[in-house]
Amino acid sequence: MAFCNTEYFDQIGNIQKIIHERERRRHELEETLFSYLRSDERLTRLKCAKMRCYAKELHEREQRAKTRNLELLGNVENLASKLKEFSIDCSRLLQKRMEYKNHITRLKKDRRKMGSRGKSEADEHPSRLSTQGLSQSAAIFMGHQTSNGSSRNDGATTKRLPSHTEQIPNHPSLPPSQSGLCMHSHVSKASGAGILSDDILNSGDFLEGRRLSDVREKQMESDWDISQRAREQQRQEELKSPHTTLKEAEVSSRSVTVNKPADIVSLEHCPTRSPSPDTTDPSDASHYMNSGGEDEEESAEDKDDSAPINQNHSDYTSNILKPDTSMHSDSDDSASQSQSGHHASRGNALIQEQSIKAMQTHCGSKHKKVSTWQSGQHHFSESPNRLSMKGFCHLLKCIEQRLETEDVVNLYRISVNEQNLSDDIISICSQRGRLDDIDLHACGAVVLQQLSMLSCSLPHGCLLPSDLINSHWSTTSKPQQIRLCLSAESAVLWDCCFTHMVQLQKQKLLSTDHIIQLFTPLLLPADATYTDKAGKLLKRLLTYKSETHYPSKSESSSSSSLPSLLNDSVEIKPARPSGTNAQTGEEQEIQSAEEDSADQSPVESIPIRETKAYQLLKQSVAQERHWSDSEEEVSEPPDAHKLEKPEVQQDILTQNNRKSVKTKPFSAVQSKAFWGESDDSNSEIEMALRPQSCNTSSHDFDDFYD
């Protein structure tokens, strides 16, 4: 009852008053705080604080920007100083250019002066010899060399070797009248400068003589280069054109014996104009023309470097190809002219006679080459470094057998340069040996080498001639169509090569494009222009072969119990075995067919009568096949039957066995699937599957499908 006294209530009332006062005080403070928060003074202070923060941040950014700008200015100044250091001073180059240009101009002027001085000295040389009584002088000119005075029978001919360094020595036994040969008016500047070196040395112009000798050496080097270039061009033209060639020694009958390189001269390059009576050694004449051509080049360079002069090279070529007809000066000028004309006519007659003989020889060799090409297979098989057709097919089969069991990478992408290994492979394949211990990359290299040789040994010079490619490259999609257009020998090589390509594609060793890029050039001539068409044709054939997938051994054995009804068109049409089935061995197919015929299942032993429509279809297919075989026999040469007889017989046996195995047991099922008849009940299937005796007469099932 202590809770009911007055003290308790007083205490409770005081506590409630205190709580009420504190609550009222809290409300007042909240109102004051809210009014302060909403006051303009506080908002102004907040804005001032934010502005101060912004101002401080801007000041810091300004300081950083100034520092960065100062750094950039310093970098720019450094770059400018480095650019000034590495800048090119073109003024020095221009100055050097002007100096060299002036130097070249001075050299040209000095050269022209030396040439004119040498010419004038050459013109003044005969008079100088007559006054001083020198015992040695010589000149090289475009004509015969005749002696002065009464000594006409003692004339001599001079010959300059290709080195152009030989000089005529002073002969002590000759008198001055005989040593000084008759000078001709047409004397070249270079020859005069080279021959008059003794006179220049005897005179006071020793320095000028040295300059002339330097010019002479440069001219000799240029002459030798041009002669080598002309001879090389002549050899190339002779290789390109089958024209008759003739040696220079056979033209001149009374020429002086001279040690000169024997060059073969083509008839089309022989000069058509008659030889002049002043004809002498062609090397000296070519040297005269070369010196004139060099003077023309100098004048052309002085005239602002105009178009180059090609007359030098052409004149030199025409003179270097001119036959040597050097003759003794046994009589006067008129006699020498008539004699030179006689030798020229005799040389022309000899050229014509040699050309007729050479043309006959060329025709005979060409005829012999054609006959050798026709019988090239016998020589081809006898060569020790070449494979025969059978040996090449054996090599491909060995490679394909090893590809099925071994993992090979980059079969035809690695070249093997061991000749002994290649010879061993060729000898083993020629003897039909095994290649289990030999590297496949070496075998691949031999395949590429021998395929090219075999293709070149065929009658058309290649496996795929141009007429075949042009007629089939856009339409043909089956390999059999290409095979029908080839000869017997070419067909064997085509089967081996195409089967090998299919195996490479099937094993995924090479892509289709790589196979085409690798084998197409080997099946065509070296200069074939239809490579793209042949590549497209091979790509279409390989694509068709990959799309028409032939089952492997396991697939064919697993599916031998019941053939697919969707492939009735392929089963009905008798065709030759494919490349993959032919590769595994046709003898195994014959044995398997005999075993299947011996061990027939109860279903296969049931004789089922075929419909008349199906029999008519089989007859039409057989007639078409007989017609195609007759066309193939007509198109092939008579000796092709000897080469292909075993293969054709084996194909016929394989086709007959396959036809008897496949079409006989399931002819009724195939005919129903072919004609689209429906089988609503299972009674006929049960009847066919029910085991019956093998001697059941066939007339019990006459109305089975009627």
UniProtKB/Swiss-Prot annotation:
The keyword Cytoplasm applies. Residues 272-283 have a biased composition (Low complexity). One of its GO terms (cellular component) is cell projection. Residues 105-116 have a biased composition (Basic residues). Residues 293-304, 586-598 have a biased composition (Acidic residues). It is found in: Cytoplasm, Cytoskeleton, Microtubule organizing center, Centrosome; Cytoplasm, Cytoskeleton, Cilium basal body. InterPro entries: Centrosomal_kizuma (IPR026742). One of its GO terms (biological process) is spindle organization. Its main location: cytoplasm. It comes from the Eukaryota. The keyword Disulfide bond does not apply. Residues 105-184, 215-347, 571-603, 620-665, 677-706 are annotated as: Disordered. Keywords: Cell projection, Coiled coil, Cytoplasm, Cytoskeleton. Residues 128-156, 164-180, 308-320 have a biased composition (Polar residues). Residues 118-127, 215-251, 638-648 have a biased composition (Basic and acidic residues). Signal peptide: none annotated. Residues 63-113 form a coiled coil. Belongs to the kizuna family. Centrosomal protein required for establishing a robust mitotic centrosome architecture that can endure the forces that converge on the centrosomes during spindle formation. Required for stabilizing the expanded pericentriolar material around the centriole. This is Centrosomal protein kizuna. It comes from Danio rerio. The gene is kiz.
